[in-house]
Amino acid sequence: MTVDLDWENLGFNYRKLPFRYISYFKDGKWDEGQLTEDATLHISEASPALHYGQEAFEGLKAYRTKDGSIQLFRPDENAKRLQRTADRLLMPEVPVDKFVDACKQVVRANEEYVPPYGTGATLYLRPLLIGVGDIIGVHPADEYIFTIFAMPVGNYFKGGLVPTNFLIQDEYDRAAPHGTGAAKVGGNY
């Protein structure tokens, strides 16, 4: 049913799993997409994702329930947020049904890596949308890659979630006007 891992001590680290999903946008449309064992993205050195940050990502989890079934947590909401981010970055939207289906394919293909119920671990999915192609000027790409890879993870923080005191400053806003503060892009992290 599952692989032999120390499920309760995974941490939040990359682990290469057997399968991931990849789809290409070219000539104004997405291809069908497919599962692949190739964990390498082959892109042009002139890709806008590398020079101008034309990339977006999501993060969502699949978990095993008490009865052994596997659930994805709100993949449609992640798909909609990726669409909003894509729109903000002048990228083509990934249709919600394509996004959700791709997530399901990745989970099914890597099912043995979905941690057992009760361990506190989950299967983390990382959807990624990047602008590729030979574009060196400051304008949107004409080709894109949408990919999803997965890995079993534990808590993001080593000690788990621990309450902490903090101060919320509401007098200043460091976000640039009309910027990417509401988008899930690498430049915000």
Residue ranges and their predicted role:
Residues 1-106, 135-189:
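Helix-start/capping segments and mature chain N-termini
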Residues 109, 131-132:
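Intrinsically disordered, low-complexity linker/loop segments enriched in Gly/Pro
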Residues 118-130:
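Extended, Lys/Arg-enriched charged tracts that mediate electrostatic binding to polyanionic substrates
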Residues 115:
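Basic, glycine/lysine-rich polyanion-binding surfaces/domains
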